[in-house]
Amino acid sequence: MTTLHPIIGVAANERRDAGDDMGHMAISYNPSGYIKAVQLVGGLPIMIPIGDPMNAKRYISMIDKLVLAGGQNVAPEFYGEVETIKSNDYNRERDAFEIALINEAIKQNKPIVGVCRGMQLVNVALGGSLNQ
């Protein structure tokens, strides 16, 4: 008898300072700890690269659960504030895309696991605020 493993979408991060060996191309990645954890509990992990928020519905329809990993700070404009602390540690494209994933996962009644930044982003997507 074959048991189907749940498909777990792990939202990717992006490294933009890849260096000369990659020709200054951005690299999409998931930290291996997230992938191993999903596998350890019997899930089949797939990476969801940062992209157009309009594609969130399609991505979420392909998975059983969504994992949002840690990473950069959430940009203040997503929780209704003006940036008071200047930082290069924002990825607004990622913020917008993952908020779309969260909203769509809620619409499709798919479970969401947020770790660190991921949990902060769930809070923001649901109308919450953060301290800068």
Question: Model segments located where?
Answer:
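N-terminal beta1-alpha1 cap of cysteine-dependent amidohydrolase-like domains
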Residues: 1-115, 123-126, 131
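Catalytic nucleophile loop
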Residues: 119
